[in-house]
């Protein structure tokens, strides 16, 4: 089982898809990594040679922010928005959508399940 950036890649998936299991690497990044490493994107993870794995690992270490570093940067930027009290930061703090979506109805995923308010009936 190939282990890259602290993540065990799934054995039976193509390497192009397997690399997307690493936080911070999507499909486009995965394709560009494989192109630079000159590894066929249709090879299964279990069929990779040690040389291929080391090439991929080296490219990811040099050029990409992945896993813990990427998560830390994301949380720090959200924390910074909340500290400077900008609109996006306040929306993060209140658990509401950030990008102008309506909240009178919908937005259930972001706001959580319904909370019944006592004494609120239509007159």
UniProtKB/Swiss-Prot annotation:
Pfam families reported for this sequence:
Ribosomal_S13
| SUPFAM superfamilies hit by this protein | S13-like H2TH domain
Xref: Gene3D superfamilies: 1.10.8.50, 30s ribosomal protein s13, domain 2
Which GO terms of the molecular function aspect are on file? Answer: rRNA binding; structural constituent of ribosome
- Per UniProt, the ranges with Basic residues bias are 101-123
Q: What is its main location?
A: plastid
Tell me which PROSITE patterns the record gives: RIBOSOMAL_S13_1, RIBOSOMAL_S13_2
According to the UniProt record, one GO cellular component term is: cytosol
UniProt keyword annotation of rRNA-binding present: yes
Where does this protein reside within or beyond the cell? Plastid, Chloroplast
Q: Which UniProt keywords apply?
A: Chloroplast, Plastid, Ribonucleoprotein, Ribosomal protein, RNA-binding, rRNA-binding
The answer to whether UniProt assigns keyword Ribonucleoprotein to this entry is: yes
From the UniProt entry, list the residue stretches annotated as the region Disordered.
Answer: 92-123
Name one process (GO BP) from the record: translation
Looking up NCBIfam families in the UniProt record yields: uS13_bact
What is known about its subunit structure? Answer: Part of the 30S ribosomal subunit.
What does the UniProt function comment say about this protein?
A: Located at the top of the head of the 30S subunit, it contacts several helices of the 16S rRNA.
Q: Which family does it belong to?
A: Belongs to the universal ribosomal protein uS13 family.
Protein's recorded name:
Small ribosomal subunit protein uS13c
